[in-house]
């Protein structure tokens, strides 16, 4: 056992971790359909969330300040020592998001409803707040209760039960 072999084994294992059998994936393949509420959620998601959560993994792979209240955790700023990176955290993939609670880098939200409530009315104006969360000087992302409910229904279509229940993992 050497560090190189451990790295190679871990790399091979991680290459096996492919989640691509969710309802969303089946819709893309033409073997399933969204409900009307899921379709409405997808539309709302594309309009209000996809600037950060895009692509097949539903992440832009960047680091952003998403308007959480400031804590001692400087996020990426602790690594880069760049003040512009303070309180910026990795934009996560939303694949299997319904199974990955608690949410945010510090686990402060226990439900997707609370996450969407944060973006709708809880965004804090901090020095490094991402500009997407401060359009025209207004904080947050305007979301109706129906949009939030439908977005959550859409997000649930990103869950791949086959992957989650795979006995190999």
What is the meaning of each model-derived region?
Residues 1-169:
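Periplasmic c-type cytochrome electron-transfer domains
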